[in-house]
């Protein structure tokens, strides 16, 4: 897990995170980013960054489909195992706890394996009912 703690979550911070991932992924590998529909992910500066990095593909999850985003499971575990009922003296202490959790997680991490082929997942998405307004 590559993690960054940032005070804000705007397009600039997102681009800095993308650059971190870009530097960490070996050359020649394609990168598929699964994202929610947060405005910062679709900002013109982010789109320009994406245009300059052809090995990247963004996939946006449908609204109310956070279960498709594998990082949500990581956030849930982080919350349950480290943050809930935790006591932190401030933001720096909280960020240090998060960084320690990520480091410990990475000591035992294994690659995420989808249990279904991409075609089956995409087909299931098409069967979801349209969101009601």
Write out the residue ranges for each language-model feature.
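Short functional hotspots at interaction and active-site rims
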Residues: 1-133
């Amino acid at each position: 897990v590559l993690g960054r703690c940032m005070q804000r979550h705007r397009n600039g911070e997102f681009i800095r995170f993308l650059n971190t991932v870009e530097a960490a992924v070996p050359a020649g590998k394609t990168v598929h980013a699964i994202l929610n529909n947060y405005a910062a992910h679709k900002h013109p500066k982010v789109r320009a960054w994406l245009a300059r990095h052809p090995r990247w593909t963004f996939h946006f999850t449908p609204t109310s489909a956070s279960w498709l985003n594998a990082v949500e499971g990581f956030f849930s575990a982080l919350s349950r195992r480290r943050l809930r009922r935790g006591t932190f003296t401030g933001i720096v202490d909280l960020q240090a706890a998060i960084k320690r959790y990520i480091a410990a997680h990475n000591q035992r991490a294994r690659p995420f394996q989808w249990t279904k082929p991409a075609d089956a997942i995409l087909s299931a998405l098409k069967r979801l009912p349209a969101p009601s307004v």
